[in-house]
Amino acid sequence: MKRLSLALLLLGTLGTPLFAQSAKVTPLLDKPLTGIPGKEGLMITVTFPPGASDMIHRHNAHAFVYVLEGRIIMQVRGGELVTLGPGQTFYEAPNDIHVVGKNASSTEPAKFLVFFVKDKGAPVLVPAR
């Protein structure tokens, strides 16, 4: 429970400047990965209201994205711009810079699940240029 509280605090402080102000980030799970020394898993949902986007950032983690509702537009630096709908996935490697992340709709919300594999205690989100 202490780890989940820390994750909530971390997401609350880092999420504000990195995600659209009105994006809702909900932590679901924070768990040490005992089979992978020094690593932990973190699972969150992100809900973008209509037209919302996030700032350029990186995760310094493996990030596995699964779209639950709506449509999102994603791109990492040097990668292809993709539009994803429910059931589609997106991957960000630890060294990727996430340059585009936004709701494709100006009228409907979008929601996606993200599972991170990261170093224990490392920040989830880091601003980038």
At which residue positions do the language-model features occur?
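N-terminal targeting signals for Sec/Tat export/insertion, comprising classic cleavable signal peptides
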Residues: 29-61
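Short acidic-glycine-tyrosine-enriched beta hairpin
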Residues: 33-37, 48-49, 78-95
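Histidine-centered metal-chelating micro-motifs
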Residues: 53-55, 73, 90, 94-103
